[in-house]
Amino acid sequence: MEDRIALTNIKKKLHGQLALLSEQYQVKSLGMFGSYVRHEQSTSSDLDLLVAFNEMPGLLKFIELENYLTDLLGIKVDLVMQENLKPRIGKRILREVVPV
């Protein structure tokens, strides 16, 4: 039950930032996947986020976004660009992803 509450709270925080993320970082869509979605996270787990961009950011802007989300949520965030998904693992991730 606590896992579901944590996931819901994370989703609410992220959803509340979508306009800012779109404006400042050109984020088109954001979704969660991985251990948090499967309710298998531990205290050392990071939060896996799948991101698609309207305009591809440079490396520094990408890292800035990852750090911003980590600070916002208080959880280490691992950003994965949807555009860079490998076919085999990409299918699994896309089946699991929970849109924000």
Language model segments and positions:
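Helical scaffold of the NTase/Pol beta-like nucleotidyltransferase catalytic core
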Residues: 1-30
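Metal-dependent nucleotidyltransferase catalytic core
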Residues: 4-5, 11, 53-83
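Conserved beta-strand core positions
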Residues: 30, 47-49, 77
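Catalytic metal-binding acidic patch
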Residues: 34, 39-58
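Short, charged recognition helix plus adjacent turn
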Residues: 88-92
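Short hydrophobic/aromatic patches at helix-to-coil boundaries
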Residues: 94-100
